[in-house]
Amino acid sequence: MNLVDAFVTKVISGPYEEYGKWWVDVEYIAWGVPGKSRLMFDSREQAQEVQEGFRFLT
């Protein structure tokens, strides 16, 4: 399976805890195509680092 770099264009929600993990809702762009997703983190500190331009794999 191939992974694609995605970049956050807008943070929709602040970090919130659900199912024992921390989540952040974001809008992103990958290969020129916009999308929405929920990013999962192990700690609140990691989730708070998400800002515009944050890179993740999708």
Model features per residue range: what roles?
Residues 1-2:
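Short aromatic-glycine motifs in intrinsically disordered, low-complexity regions
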Residues 6-17:
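Short amphipathic beta-strand and strand-loop transition segments with alternating hydrophobic
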Residues 15-34:
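Short aromatic-glycine-(Arg/Gly/Cys) micro-motifs in beta-strand/loop hairpins
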Residues 35-39:
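Short beta-strand segments
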Residues 40-58:
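A short, charged, amphipathic alpha-helix used as a generic interaction element across diverse proteins
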